Amino acid sequence: MFEQNTDATQSVDFYAQMDGSYENSKLFNCDYKIVVNGPFVSPCEEFVTVKGQTTLDLKATPFARISASAQVAGKKVTVTYRVIPTSSNYDVSEVYGYWNFAPGVDNGSANQAGKQTVNEKEGTIVFDLENDKNYKDNLYKIQGNGNKIYVRIGAKTEGVINYSTIIETIV
């Protein structure tokens, strides 16, 4: 985010939440240019005039859209997914299934307790938690959080990862 029509040269950085929402409460009334870099077909750019409380919906096109649902049977979580590239020219090279005991779930090693990699754009990924060391090691955290775990699908498309929404499950 860059102030416009001022002498400011530094960007005002802000980050989106896992669900894509964002909030920046450290802005002055001013004109800004917003440039969002991410796993999008092209950078998302918008101009906005901030006057008091201002809302701006940024629109970006991901390389792939991912739908996912989860079913729990005992200590097995089955995630059914479908990856749809936004262009037939885009290569989906890998699909990842993740689970975590905290609501943050992505490809970062701190944001996953388990990960499986497949190559199919549509299918299922099964997490057998009963036989999962990370599940056993973190069972006290999971039980302290109402037996919730969180799952998500990621798809590596054109070298970047787009994600499904995070699904909360109870095991």
Explain the meaning of each model-derived region.
Residues 20-22, 54-56, 121-129, 138:
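Short strand-edge motifs at loop-to-beta-strand transitions and within beta-strands
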